[in-house]
Design a protein with these regions (language model features):
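Residues within mature, well-folded domains
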Residues: 1-95
């Protein structure tokens, strides 16, 4: 599924919807470089998908950005965010 980088106005009001297991470098390959983290994250991807779904991928309460295999949080306004992120990840990383 096609996506663009979203800004904070689009991701405002998102919250935890699910998780995905991945390496940091895999997320960078699929979704590009992340934004700097906020109060309780070190990095975050903010994404707007072509179907209107908005999603975030982030670590939570980590002291350093996880580089190994990690259970990343997926935020959104509905469970569709999890589907959009995981299906795009699988499609792109298997290509």
């Amino acid at each position: 599924m096609k996506f663009t980088k979203a800004d904070w106005t689009e991701t405002n009001g998102t919250h935890l919807q699910g998780y995905m297991q991945a390496y940091y470098h895999e997320l960078v390959e699929v979704f590009g470089e992340p934004e700097a983290g906020g109060d309780k994250t070190t990095v975050e991807w903010c994404l707007a998908f072509e179907d209107g779904t908005v999603a975030t991928i982030y670590d939570w309460k980590e002291y350093e950005t996880p580089m190994g295999s990690h259970q990343w949080h997926i935020g959104g306004k509905s469970k569709q965010a999890v589907h959009a992120v995981t299906s795009t990840f699988k499609e792109t990383s298997n290509a």
